């Protein structure tokens, strides 16, 4: 689907979030750059794909993701602000981070300095330890 064909772009989700641009896409969901209208706050808005939202197991996994992340208290994990359903659309509004995605960085510079790799891996492991600890 091209960005111009995306029906979510420009839409208002749950009367609270304006969808501005597609950030990324995965098997179950799409993540958009959005604005929380009441506060003028930028957010990342994760929308469960409509065809997936009809599958009870997928909805359960989406809800479990919310429960797991809201329990995390790590400086290496993003914060979830809101979760809900608007019409047939399940959504998560979360902290929006600025910066370059790791994938883009690796495409631009496939060989990273060892100290940067250590820094990234350490932060990732600390967050995983918190999540599974």
What are these model-derived regions, one by one?
Residues 24, 64, 72-76, 89, ...:
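Flexible N-lobe loop architecture of eukaryotic-like protein kinase catalytic domains
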Residues 19-26, 31:
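Protein kinase glycine-rich loop
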